[in-house]
């Protein structure tokens, strides 16, 4: 009975949902033209004045919606960035007091697409994956936004392929050496030479 009550839905190539088989392009234009004066709510864009020979790039700040992120004491911030930006990001994280970072070499592709390598004059593009670096940082809830903004500031070039940041809730943190859990295990104490 439930199957007979549902309406067929088609997804068009433009991503609109409709109970019609086809959507005319003019329908899409009229929908989109209604949004021409709106401002994206997900980004704060402010232009940054150029320093030296650098280009003018807008300052991008990720905004968080309390409904969007599940409530948790700890969060893991995973950032996939360009390998040659890792030093800038790591230094910036140290300046804001973040000392516990795990870094892994990864490969993948997104909007940037894959790359083609040249060896001996021949082109090879077996898997089209691009080398990136994944940074994993577990922080308390009140540190998430500053970590995200620091990563964006350090990793951003303004070009396709700058990377992605993922934020995941973490249910618990356990320090292997002592068995401590929660905030005691997450907290990094002492100087860089003394273990915590």
From Swiss-Prot:
Residues that, per the record, bind ATP: 108-112, 161-164
GO molecular function: acetylglutamate kinase regulator activity; ATP binding; magnesium ion binding
Disruption outcome: No visible phenotype under normal growth condition, but increased sensitivity to elevated levels of nitrite.
InterPro entries (UniProt xref): N-reg_PII (IPR002187), N-reg_PII-like_a/b (IPR011322), N-reg_PII/ATP_PRibTrfase_C (IPR015867), N-reg_PII_CS (IPR017918)
Keywords in alphabetical order: ATP-binding, Chloroplast, Magnesium, Metal-binding, Nucleotide-binding, Plastid, Transcription, Transcription regulation, Transit peptide
Transit peptide, residues from-to: 1-61
Database matches in SMART domains: P-II (SM00938)
Binding residues annotated for Mg(2+), in chain numbering: 110
Gene Ontology biological-process entries: anthocyanin-containing compound biosynthetic process; regulation of arginine biosynthetic process via ornithine; regulation of fatty acid biosynthetic process; regulation of nitrogen utilization; response to light stimulus; response to sucrose
GO cellular component: chloroplast; chloroplast thylakoid; cytosol; plastid
Pfam families in UniProt: P-II
Entries under SUPFAM superfamilies matching the protein: GlnB-like
Signal sequence range: none
Subcellular location: Plastid, Chloroplast
Subunit structure: Homodimer. Interacts with NAGK. Interaction with NAGK is dependent of MgATP and inhibited by 2-oxoglutarate, arginine, glutamate, citrate, and oxaloacetate.
Family, similarity comment: Belongs to the P(II) protein family.
Function: Participates in sensing carbon and organic nitrogen status and regulates some steps of primary carbon and nitrogen metabolism. Required for nitrite uptake in chloroplasts and regulates arginine biosynthesis through interaction with acetylglutamate kinase (NAGK) in chloroplasts. Regulates fatty acids synthesis in chloroplasts by interacting with the acetyl-CoA carboxylase complex and inhibiting acetyl-CoA carboxylase (ACCase) activity.
Name of this chain's protein: Nitrogen regulatory protein P-II homolog
Organism, scientific name: Arabidopsis thaliana (Mouse-ear cress)
Gene: GLB1
């Amino acid at each position: 009975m439930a199957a007979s009550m549902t309406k067929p839905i088609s997804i068009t190539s433009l991503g609109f949902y409709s109970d019609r088989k086809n959507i005319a392009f003019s329908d899409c234009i009229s929908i989109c033209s209604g949004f021409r004066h709106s401002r994206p709510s997900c980004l704060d864009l402010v232009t940054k004045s150029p320093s030296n020979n650098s280009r003018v790039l807008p300052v991008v700040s990720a905004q968080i919606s309390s409904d969007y992120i599940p409530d948790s004491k700890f969060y893991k911030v995973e950032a996939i960035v360009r390998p040659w930006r890792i030093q800038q990001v790591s230094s910036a994280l140290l300046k804001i007091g973040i000392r516990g970072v795990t870094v892994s070499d990864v490969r993948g592709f997104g909007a940037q697409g894959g790359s083609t390598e040249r060896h001996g004059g021949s082109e090879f593009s077996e898997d089209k994956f691009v080398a990136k670096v994944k940074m994993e940082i577990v922080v308390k809830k009140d540190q998430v936004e500053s970590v995200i903004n620091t990563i964006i500031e350090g990793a951003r070039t303004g070009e396709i392929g700058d990377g992605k940041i993922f934020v995941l809730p973490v249910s618990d943190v356990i320090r292997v050496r002592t068995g401590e859990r929660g905030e005691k295990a997450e907290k990094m104490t002492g100087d860089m030479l003394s273990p915590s």
